[in-house]
Swiss-Prot record:
Disulfide bonds: none annotated. This is Actin-binding protein Smlt3054. PANTHER family: ANKYRIN REPEAT DOMAIN-CONTAINING PROTEIN 39 (PTHR24171:SF9), ANKYRIN REPEAT DOMAIN-CONTAINING PROTEIN 39-RELATED (PTHR24171). Keywords: Actin-binding, ANK repeat, Periplasm, Repeat, Secreted. It comes from Stenotrophomonas maltophilia (strain K279a). The keyword Secreted applies. GO terms for molecular function: actin filament binding; protein homodimerization activity. ANK repeats lie at residues 192-221, 225-254. Exists as a dimer as well as a higher order oligomer.
Length: 274
């Protein structure tokens, strides 16, 4: 399994012109196996902190380059200081958003000396839970490179909305808050008309209702099938999600598809259970 992960990482790293790609891929493969359960949204939120504001760095270990073929100079994204500073500045139990902010506070510090051996030692110790960000970063940089875009464009093109949906479906509040903090719109529906609040309600993640509403989510929004978040929570028997939605103004008598209300759907589910 580890070999499969390492080979996958190498395919991502080689096109980036990264030195010591094989050694780095091996280290990342080991860390990937040690960080099970980390949601992609959390990984990508941390990766974003290292991608939106590239710092100057010499060619060498852990320098990710976004190459622009039409220009002689290639912008560089150096992850050495960022990963190191996440470990130094953020508390050991920091939230995803705190980790992002901790890195952002250090972006101006461009002269911190860091070598591969020092970073590797750090990674092998207390940083194991955060090193998954490299895989997400590799994909983000490769995407930007394919578009002949510089590193700053990652901020404009980052698919935060998709990651916000992932966090809403998985129930990861820290990742959700980080995505919103990076500019994801809590009101924006996906291709099926489902907003992040629809996804949270569908899967019964009641703890996400308040942060989504505070970020502007509309409790009355209907998806493409004519369901509001409360309809979905009632349909899937998520009582606590229903209570939280109603506490934020969701109407249990709101008509949806074919005039069905959340109250009617709830009663139907109760009848079916008898």
């Amino acid at each position: 399994m580890e070999m499969d992960i390492q080979e996958s990482l190498l395919r991502l790293l080689r096109p980036l012109g990264l030195q010591r790609a094989e050694a780095l891929a091996g280290a990342l493969a080991r860390e990937a196996g040690a960080s099970k359960g980390l949601h992609d949204s959390q990984v990508l939120a941390r990766a974003h902190a290292l991608s939106v504001a590239p710092v100057e760095g010499r060619l060498g270990d852990l320098v990710w380059q976004v190459r622009q073929r039409e220009h002689d100079g290639a912008p560089q994204v150096d992850l050495r200081w960022g990963l190191h500073r996440l470990g130094l500045d953020a508390p050991s139990r920091a939230s995803t958003r705190d980790l992002v902010r901790a890195y952002e506070r250090r972006l101006a510090d461009r002269n911190e000396p860091m070598v591969y051996s020092t970073l590797a030692e750090r990674v092998a110790g207390s940083m194991a839970e955060h090193t998954s960000l490299f895989q997400g970063m590799a994909m983000a940089v490769e995407e930007a490179r394919a578009r002949r875009s510089d590193a700053n464009r990652l901020r404009e093109n980052a698919p935060w909305q998709g990651w916000l949906v992932g966090a809403s479906r998985a129930g990861h509040e820290a990742a959700l808050l980080a995505c919103i903090g990076m500019g994801a719109d809590a009101r924006l529906p996906d291709a099926s008309g489902n907003t992040p609040l629809h996804h949270a309600a569908r899967f019964g993640h009641f703890s996400l209702v308040t942060p989504l509403v505070e970020a502007g989510a509309d409790v009355a929004a209907l998806n493409a099938h004519g369901w509001a978040p409360l309809h979905l929570a009632a349909l899937h028997k998520h009582a606590r999600a229903c209570l939280h939605l109603m506490a934020h103004g969701a109407n249990p008598e709101q008509p949806g598809w074919r005039g069905r209300t959340p109250t009617r759907m709830h009663r139907h589910e109760q009848t079916q259970a008898l």
